[in-house]
């Protein structure tokens, strides 16, 4: 149980880190016009990933690939959904906090534009393919 709680907490922190990386991406797209903003945003998104790696946080997308090794313990398999829920809580919590801060600003318009364009792209994909790719994180 202690292992699962640690995985849950580290999952929440990983979700917060990825939320931070995503927010840095949006800020760059918002404040630096054109392709340069997207490139800088992509580089700054790595801040979230770097935080996950250096702090040894539990990010589902980083752990799911280990399933195919077949050498994991039962606790590892149990911790996957626990960390996924933690990731979601951390990312949604960070997103909600940012929404509360920036809801009446032009930054939120940029967030809406980016999310809408991404959702439009995914909506043309096959439903089963989207579910499989999102669950296995492209593995």
PLM features per residue range, with description:
Residues 1-139:
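Alpha-helical transmembrane segments and their helix-helix packing motifs
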